[in-house]
Each structure stands twice: as C-alpha cells, then as structure tokens.
C-alpha cells in the first residue's frame, strides 16, 4: 500500500523549515501531519489518540517558538509522535517502539528537540521550571513551554511545581491540553477573542500600569482593585485556581484552530512576564473517525487497518495475567465484603475494570495520584477493610515513601498487586518493572511474592485476601499466561514456603517469578547433557524459605537463582542468607541471574530477556560455566602450561 501524499510536510522536515512556511499553509500541513501519523502508527502500533489531538498545537508551537533553543517539554510523551515527525525523525517514525528504533516517548539521547525525557506523568512543569530558572541564571531569554494534559493535573507534583513557579515569578509557559474537557469548554469566537485580548501586549501593559497606580492607593483599595480585575477576567475566561497559584491564565481556546492558537502563542512569547498558563481544549483522536468514536480504545493501539480501524490482535493461548488477577479478586470479594480495590487511573490496565463491573461501590479510581492511592488504601486498612492497591511496578515507585511511612511502619495490611513486573518490551526502561522486589523486600515485615504462572497468581490473590498480619505484595508480568490449568478458586499458600517443581541431584535452579518456564526448559537441556537438575519455585522473596534453600544447597553442587528484577532483589536476599548461615563454606557453586545493571532499551520482551541471559540458553550457559564445561556440556580441558 502506497503512503499518502504529503507535499507540504515533505518541505518541512525540521522546525526551521516549518517556520519558513506562510501561516496560510499551516492548516494543510497539519492535515498532512495527521495523515502521516495515522499511517505510521498503523504499521507500528503505539499511542495514537493523544498525538492526533495535538497536531495543530504541535505545528503552532514549532512555528511560533525558536526550537530547539526554546524548550518544549511534553508531559508523559504519549502525544509526542507529531513532534518527532516535525523534528527530523520522520524517516524513522515507522521504527517507533521497535528494537533499535525511536522511543515511544521523548528522550534526550534521541534528539536535541527533546530537552527532557518523559513517560511517567506530571513531571513537565517541574522540569520546565528548572530550565526556566537556569535560563534566567545564565542570562538567556529562551522560552520554556511545558505541555501537560488535564489527566496529569490530577497528580500533586503538578501543583507543587505551579505553586513554586508562582512564588518565583519565573518566565515559564504552561499549556494545559484539556482533551477531556474536564475543566471548561471553549465558547467559540468570544472565547478566542478574549484569549487573544488578555494575552496581548496592550492589555497586559495597561494591567501593569494599573498596578503601578494602585500601589499608590491605600492597601485595602489595592486589594479591591486586584481582586476586581481577577474576578472580571475569571468570569469571562475561567482559571481562578491557576491565578491563585500565581499564573496568568489565558483561555480556554480551541486547540484545533490555528487562527486562534497562533496569535495567542505569539502574544505570550512576546509579552511574557512571570508564569503563564494557556488553557487549550482538544479532542483525543481528532481527524480519525474510529479514534474519535472510541477514544479509550485508540489511546494505545496494536497495528491496525487505516480504512476500517480494525486492530490486529494475535490469538491468545491463555488468559492474561491481568485478567486472571481481576477475576480472582472478584471471586475473593464474593466471599468477603471487606475486600475493596484501589487504582491510580489504570482500571483497565490493572484488571479492576472487571472488579468495578461486579462491585461498583467497592472500587476507587483516585486518578494519577499514586502517593494518595497508597495512603488512601492505608486508611481503609486501618478501619478493618482489605484494600488491594493495584499499581504497575514502575508507578509504585512514585508512592514509595507512602509505602514505607504510611503502610509498612504502621504494619497495615494493605495488599499490593504489582502488574507489569519485569520487562515490558516496547515501552522500554521507563515502564520496566525492575525494582519493586528490591525496594519492598528491604522493608521489615513486608511479605513479597511473585507468581510463576497464572494458577500461582490465583493462589496469591487468595493468600493476600486472607493475610491480615501486615502488608503483602505479589508481582506478575504483562501478557498472557502460560496455559496451565486454573483452579476455580485459589488456595491459601503457607507464608514463606516455596515448592519443588522438578527433582534432580546435581544442579538446582531456584526461580522467583515467571522465569520458571525457562528454568524447566533449561533443566531438560541440562538433563540431556547428563546434569540432573532440580527446579524450585521460590514463591517468596520475603520471608525466604530457609528450609528449601538449605535442602538445595545440601543436595546439589550448583545453585542458580533466576529472577526478573534488578540487582538488590531476590538473589541478593538469598546470597545474604547463604553467607550468614555459613552455607557458602562448603564449596557450593552459586550463580545469580537477574536483569543487567543498565536501563535496557525497548524491544520485544523475549529478545530482551535473552539479551539479559534470562532465557533457557542463558541459564544453561551459566550452569556450564560454573562447572567449567563448554557449550556442548563437555568438561573443558585445562589450558596447558607454556614456559
């Protein structure tokens, strides 16, 4: 299928060329950019809806501002695909989220037009404020623009940054991309006129002059004059909250109308003094009918047919871990009316949408607010409820102080289902679930589990529901299960007890998590090479199964720990126990396999695990090396001494 014709876009591969185009050509350029975006994402998959919603805004920003000298920071980065196309990366846009290709988010190492990396929400205003202050300290006059969605404004960090920006009176532009119309809709021509008026040099100059006059009046009259101006402007334009935080508010304006966007951006660029917030209203999926009709389904997409909008979906061999968690929690909630669920703006991603359908009054979506989610769950637990606070591994990092201070120190029985544990593939290092085992197992009294398959996950949901002695977590990966038989309801596991899955005599593989299947495959290969191999499923990183570990040490020559986490996790706890228990004093050969001490770039999960040595081949190679055998399993001959 041939690619769409884009004559204007072909002339503007970089922002300097874009700025050379006359303004009357920009609407056509925007349409060509939208067409190119749809065509590209149809072949790669990725985040579509958000990018379609900011096409005109992206064109306007790069036309008005002198990028890359002026800084544009895209919050989260889902909406940055049009930005990538316009900033010299169009020739690689069809490598999005593929190994060796473009990142799905902004990335400093990728382009000078990406001044700050993103993927987690609500960081843009803080980063932008730092850049704005650095610019002032350096005597620069650059503009710094942070583009943040209304969803990201539910996180406290955004308001912390705005409060600080207002106090510093910094030269910072924040563009609020309101694509859910959750704050206020634009009201047509009058709204556009007012936005252009209040953002302009004349209005703001008169306003400043009036302030100077007011300073000569008694203080109570100064206050009345200031409040009168603010109230009058707020009445017509909204934005009182942002004014109270110290921002000059402009909007709301139609984010798809370049005739409205361009003059406002120019006014703010030319007259900016102190922080300014421009409220832009957009539509997710704008310009592509299937995405406009179902914005939630086109936020993140698989490859799809451009004509029909139908997404390609590979057949599943088993239910996903996320679905198993959701259905298992529903089953437990039927037996226990104290079970409730908490999510931080990810009900579908965590499987709690299913729970919400079954128990709508027992699920709580708190928005993008992981810190609040954790402490909210702690409050529920303190009153005798059984909260399951379901958060992706990478996002739980955002609420770690609350996990420590509000949950762990008080020993409150909050349950933490940790989705997206391990490598997540196309979303790369910003979304990898690498660190949760290490940072949770470091906490006294915290029970830390990992499911090796979907049946084990069902058992762990039941175990967590029954456990009231303190906080407990269980981790599981993205994607489909391995296809094991599922019990109708999980069983309660004995805390701190693992299991032997395969018996052997010479080599022991101790797995924590879903690398168990690779361990079993490696055991087959090792057995064929004459190395009888035991495979154990640890189940718990804390408390460790000391009896199981002692048995593996006593009965085997080699012990290999295998996990889908970073340095400092399960293997570190096992090694510490081996050392303190004197189990390393007997000539045991011990090896630890975990994620490498780097941030792995995006790619396909299987290839990434192979790169990390966490597949069958890597495990076998590690055992052979420990026993000084070559790749065929033969004992390596000693190197002859040469004088």
From Swiss-Prot:
Annotated binding of thiamine diphosphate, by residue: 78, 119-121, 151-152, 179, 288, 370
Presence of keyword DNA-binding: no
PROSITE patterns: TRANSKETOLASE_1, TRANSKETOLASE_2
Catalyses which reaction(s): D-glyceraldehyde 3-phosphate + pyruvate + H(+) = 1-deoxy-D-xylulose 5-phosphate + CO2
Pfam families given in the database record: DXP_synthase_N, Transket_pyr, Transketolase_C
GO molecular function: 1-deoxy-D-xylulose-5-phosphate synthase activity; magnesium ion binding; thiamine pyrophosphate binding
UniProt-annotated binding residues for Mg(2+): 150, 179
Keywords (A to Z) from UniProt: Isoprene biosynthesis, Magnesium, Metal-binding, Thiamine biosynthesis, Thiamine pyrophosphate, Transferase
GO BP field: 1-deoxy-D-xylulose 5-phosphate biosynthetic process; glyceraldehyde-3-phosphate metabolic process; terpenoid biosynthetic process; thiamine biosynthetic process
Cofactor(s) listed in the protein's UniProt record: Mg(2+); thiamine diphosphate
Cofactor binding comment, as recorded: Binds 1 Mg(2+) ion per subunit. Binds 1 thiamine pyrophosphate per subunit.
Pathway where it operates: Metabolic intermediate biosynthesis; 1-deoxy-D-xylulose 5-phosphate biosynthesis; 1-deoxy-D-xylulose 5-phosphate from D-glyceraldehyde 3-phosphate and pyruvate: step 1/1
Family classification: Belongs to the transketolase family. DXPS subfamily.
Record NCBIfam families: dxs, PRK05444.2-2
Biological role: Catalyzes the acyloin condensation reaction between C atoms 2 and 3 of pyruvate and glyceraldehyde 3-phosphate to yield 1-deoxy-D-xylulose-5-phosphate (DXP).
Designated name of the protein: 1-deoxy-D-xylulose-5-phosphate synthase
Organism of derivation: Brucella abortus (strain 2308)
Gene: dxs
